[in-house]
Amino acid sequence: MPKITAARVVVTCPGRNFVTLKIETSDGVYGVGDATLNGRELPVVSYLTDHVIPCLIGRDAHRIEDIWQYLYKGAYWRRGPVTMAAIAAVDMALWDIKAKIAGLPLYQLLGGACREGIMVYGHANGATIEETLENAAVYAAQGYKAIRLQSGVPGLKGVYGVSKDKFFYEPADGDLPTESLWSTEKYLRSAPGLFEAARDKLGWDLHLLHDVHHRLTPIEAGRLGKDLEPYRPFWMEDAVPAENQASFRLIRQHTTTPLAVGEVFNSIWDCKQLIEEQLIDYIRATVVHAGGITHLRKIASFADLHHVRTGCHGATDLSPIAMAAALHFDLSIPNFGIQEYMRHTEATDTVFPHAYTFNDGMLHPGDAVGLGVDINETEAAKYPYKRAYLPIARREDGSMHDW
């Protein structure tokens, strides 16, 4: 059996910071995993280096579930984004190793393909509704069947999801957190008009999505969901802060707009009530934040019992390693819904060469063995770590608000 002989962490910043774990075995086979936690990368590096890697050496690389349980239960201070990102990186790397030894693309070890490809959604944004829709039309012309719409809000200087670049968005943009002002009322007056204009310009064949980014109260979210109903959005994402799962019950009482949440969740316990009571339609837990493929499969299986589909987070704070892992997962589960997809920069793709491809609105992980992605450490070394914080938001009276 292949024994783990070495493991190391590589940190690189080809436009944004990524944390990669590389595990080597006695067979000469290695695997890679993503441990990136946007804006808080170095704590995960420390956790891996000081606490996880020493415990891996000498272990059987095939015993993925046992190693997962060892790292989760053995820590005692379990869960949380740092711990679960570290476990996720180990898990991805071990699945990569197992599939390479088997000579198969990972999705074949996960039960084989349930579909021919993975429907993804792109991000269209702009300072105005008109600019957002112009960019959405570009995505539609590229073959996307689903597009997330985010637009500037009149009277607010900066808004979540609206970037300087039309197609690349990195919110962690400052050596210290940048601040923006927020007005819920201005936003609620503006958002329905975005979707009305979108249906007029783009038609009804496209799936349209929207991210509220945890900024509303339950009753405000119910109001927005109700206002959006005539335009049939695919989902309303992260309508309220995710900590209070009971909030979604109130939203459900006021709207039939589908609800999605979960990118900040770290385990099945974070979403158990939401899924069990069918308070959401899509669970957005992601492979790098929720403990890797092993644990994400358990979340998906539980969700499948309650008719909840997956819609995994897939912004550029996931490296191509995590994106590849997500695609193998997506391809293999019965209750897949949709996958977020933001293209990486050319520099990032050079650091992380990968086999997955986009065609006609869908991604496919490819048939290379393992995850089908690697890290070019020579290229990675050209881009040293650069401290970057996520922004913060304040209300117009100066008080803090959820970003």
Curated annotation (Swiss-Prot):
SUPFAM superfamilies, A to Z: Enolase C-terminal domain-like, Enolase N-terminal domain-like
Residues that coordinate or bind substrate: N38, H123, E263, R284, H313, D317, E340
Cofactor: record remark: Binds 1 Mg(2+) ion per subunit.
Entry-linked InterPro entries: D-mannonate_dehydratase-like, D-mannonate_dehydratase_GalD, DgoD-like, Enolase-like_C_sf, Enolase-like_N, Enolase_C-like, MAND, Mandel_Rmase/mucon_lact_enz_CS
Record pathway: Carbohydrate metabolism; pentose and glucuronate interconversion
Class of the enzyme per the UniProt entry, highest EC level: lyase
EC number, UniProt record: 4.2.1.8
An annotated Gene Ontology molecular function: mannonate dehydratase activity
Keywords: Carbohydrate metabolism, Lyase, Magnesium, Metal-binding
Annotated site location: Important for activity and substrate specificity: A315
Keyword presence, Magnesium: yes
Keyword tRNA-binding appears in the UniProt entry: no
Active-site residues per Swiss-Prot or TrEMBL entry: Y160, H213
Pfam families in UniProt: MR_MLE_C, MR_MLE_N
GO BP of this protein: amino acid catabolic process; carbohydrate catabolic process
Binding site for Mg(2+): D211, E237, E263
Entry-linked SMART domains: MR_MLE
Enzymatic reactions: D-mannonate = 2-dehydro-3-deoxy-D-gluconate + H2O
Top-rank lineage group of the source organism: Bacteria
Cofactor(s) recorded in Swiss-Prot or TrEMBL: Mg(2+)
Function text: Catalyzes the dehydration of D-mannonate. Has no detectable activity with a panel of 70 other acid sugars (in vitro).
Family: Belongs to the mandelate racemase/muconate lactonizing enzyme family. GalD subfamily.
Record's protein name: D-mannonate dehydratase Caul1835
